[in-house]
C-alpha cells in the first residue's frame, strides 16, 4: 500500500507550510486526486491519521475531491470519460487521444489555526 508513503509526504508538506505560517495546528487538508493518479482515496483516508500523529496535522480533517478522467480525441475532437490511461475514441475509434483531466494530485488548501 503506497498510500502510506503518500500520506507521509502530504503531512510533511502541510506541516512545513503551517510552521512557516506560524500555525498552532492544521484543522483541515483539502486534496484533489484524479481517478488516473494511481491513488486510492479510501486507503489514503485510512493512512492519513497515522501519518499525521505527532505533527501539526494530527486530528485534521482530510477532504478529497476526486476528478473524473476525461480525454479528447485528436482525430475528431470528441470528449469522453476514460477508465484506463489508454483508450480509444468511442466516436471514431482513433487511438490519438489526450487525457485532459484525471491525473491530478494536488494539495488544494490547508486550514490552519494560529499558534499560542
UniProtKB/Swiss-Prot annotation:
Any one Gene Ontology molecular-function term assigned to this protein's record: zinc ion binding
Keyword Zinc: yes
InterPro entries per record: Hydgase_Ni_incorp_HypA/HybF_CS (IPR020538), HypA/HybF (IPR000688)
Any single biological process term in GO: protein modification process
Cross-referenced Pfam families: HypA (PF01155)
Keyword field contains Zinc: yes
UniProt keyword list: Metal-binding, Nickel, Zinc
Binding positions (Ni(2+)): 2
Annotated binding of Zn(2+), by residue: 73, 76, 89, 92
PANTHER family: HYDROGENASE MATURATION FACTOR HYPA (PTHR34535:SF3)
Family of this protein: Belongs to the HypA/HybF family.
Function text: Involved in the maturation of [NiFe] hydrogenases. Required for nickel insertion into the metal center of the hydrogenase.
Record-given protein name: Hydrogenase maturation factor HypA
Organism taxonomic ancestry: Bacteria, Pseudomonadati, Chlorobiota, Chlorobiia, Chlorobiales
Protein's gene: hypA
